[in-house]
Swiss-Prot record:
PANTHER family: BETA-METHYLMALYL-COA DEHYDRATASE (PTHR43664:SF1), MONOAMINE OXIDASE-RELATED (PTHR43664)
InterPro entries linked to this entry: HotDog_dom_sf (IPR029069), MaoC-like_dom (IPR002539), MCH/BMMD (IPR052342)
Name of the molecule in the record: Uncharacterized protein YdeM
Pfam family, one: MaoC_dehydratas
Organism per entry: Bacillus subtilis (strain 168)
Gene3D superfamilies to which the protein is assigned, alphabetical: Hotdog Thioesterase
Stretches assigned to the MaoC-like domain: 8-112
Length: 141
């Protein structure tokens, strides 16, 4: 979709994605190797009583779920900004996540381009919000 096809206040819901313990440990091993993500024994004695997903992974999953819906298609040029990211609740192995996306703003620019800002709100299978953040992209008008 082009910038002008989006409406402020428009809401989309993505499909869901189940996050396995192996997914969590593989991602964290490469990108966020803190004990609560990679060390089951130590994590079991910690605040969350077990392995949890990295917030960076939760952000990446949220973005993936939105992008896979295909609304940007070939009209997206580039991401421009991420703001107000909040990791609200932990994501545990076997949680199933989905994202609600709300169009917050659209700013036409020159050269047939514009900036689209959306709010990504990600929930688990119990409909508990685990992540929220704003994403802005440069997109064709």
């Amino acid at each position: 979709m082009k910038l002008d096809e989006f409406t402020i206040g428009q809401v989309f819901k993505t499909k869901s994605l189940k996050v396995s313990k192996d997914d969590i440990m593989r991602f964290a091993g490469e990108f966020d190797p803190q004990y609560m993500h990679v060390d089951e024994e130590k994590a079991s004695k910690g605040r969350f009583n077990g392995i949890i997903a990295s917030g960076i992974q939760t952000l990446a999953i949220s973005f993936k779920l939105w992008i896979e819906e295909g609304f940007y298609g070939d009209d997206i040029i580039a991401g421009t900004e991420m703001n107000h990211m909040t990791f609200i609740k932990p994501v545990y192995p076997d949680d199933e996540l989905f994202t609600i996306v709300e169009v917050l703003d659209k700013q036409p620019k020159r050269n047939e381009l514009g900036i689209l800002t959306v709010l990504l709100s990600t929930y688990n299978q119990k409909e508990v919000k685990v992540f929220e953040g704003e994403l802005s992209v440069l997109i064709k008008r």
